């Protein structure tokens, strides 16, 4: 299955913290329907305890990680300059845009779906 979604760390971290809305949304995904960037993987793996890190690792292993490319890096730099985003957020946006994926996030401060049609806010807490 070709992926449709690029998952941001907010959704995965919410799931790991027991936020039911995140868990329910993730459970609806079919195998191969979503991917995570290496940036999301690194952010999620920053658990504070060994147990958190193990749970995070197991979760991250269930998603493919497409490579970052020069094209994505160039677009991320443009988006950072244009929008003032932090570089990890700019990379997420660039990867979603270049791959034709919906960026699934809860970060409405930076990613307003009205301004950015590549963004999907699956739930609010």
Predicted features, each with a name:
Residues 1-36, 45-58, 125:
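Short, well-structured N-terminal submotif of metal-dependent ribonuclease cores
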Residues 2, 93-125:
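Acidic, PIN/NYN-like endoribonuclease modules and their adjacent C-terminal/linker elements
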Residues 8-9, 44, 76, 96, ...:
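Generic structural signal for small/hydrophobic residues in well-ordered secondary structure
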Residues 11-12, 40, 72, 91-92, ...:
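Alpha-helix capping/helix-boundary segments
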Residues 32-33, 61-64, 97-102:
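Short active-site oxyanion
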Residues 42, 61-82:
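Acidic catalytic patch
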Residues 81, 85, 101:
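Short glycine/serine/threonine/alanine-rich loop segments
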